[in-house]
Amino acid sequence: MTFETGGPRGNDIGLLDGLMTNRAMRRYTDEPVADEDIWTCLQAAVQAPSGGNIQPYQFMVVRDPGLRIGLAELYRRGWARYEPAIAPSEFPNDAVREGWERNNRATVHLAENLEHVPVIVLLLMPSIDMTVHDDEGPMPVGPTHASVYPAIQNFMLAARSLGLGTAMTTLHRIYEDDVRELVGIPERYEVLALLPLGHPTGKWGVAPRYRGADKITSWDQFGEKRTP
């Protein structure tokens, strides 16, 4: 099965086409995003499954230019600390080095231009402990985040179908308290993710992955591999 690579397309793309060709977009034009398209992405997001249908999230859509500048400044402060901390001292081969450098250039571009993206969406999650207990003790069924990430994925796929690009970022969390203060988010909410939303300058396509599904999948017993 093959999937298309190319520029923006309408909402006639198939589900698998969207899944296989959606990728993090970090370069955007300054073309506005229509309210209708924002609502479509939000409505798709809330249709995502969540544990017990609890929908443990809130969305904040930021379009005000001053607020976008403020978020961008906090994002850049975080990136200035984060980039040198993750820079590898060596690479196993040239392909890995080239891939890292290409991704880093795109990440730097987003950090330097975030305020120019027409829409920034923040994903909020209440800071609550969902652990339940019985007579035998706590039952650690996993963090609440597991019921938020599917909504983020739905949002991103809906954007893809509309010819819009986005990327899930978390660098803002380095200065999360400042982000809350800037846009008036109560302290009880964790600002889980930041998603730029706009018209991308790049192309969609099947992104290169260094490990295919056959390399990271076991069948019945850990380490038992199959070929597709």
Residue ranges and their predicted role:
Residues 80-92, 183-208:
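A glycine-rich helix N-cap at a beta->alpha junction
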Residues 2-11, 25, 190-228:
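C-terminal helix-cap and adjacent tail motif
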Residues 27-28, 58, 165-169:
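Short catalytic-loop micro-motif centered on adjacent basic/acidic residues
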Residues 46-54:
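Glycine-rich phosphate/pyrophosphate-binding beta-alpha loops
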Residues 14-31:
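Generic N-terminal amphipathic, Lys/Arg-enriched alpha-helix
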Residues 43-46, 121-182:
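Small-aliphatic-rich amphipathic alpha-helix that forms the alpha element of a beta-alpha
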Residues 44-46, 104-109, 179-181, 203-204:
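Glycine-rich, charged/polar anion/phosphate-binding loops
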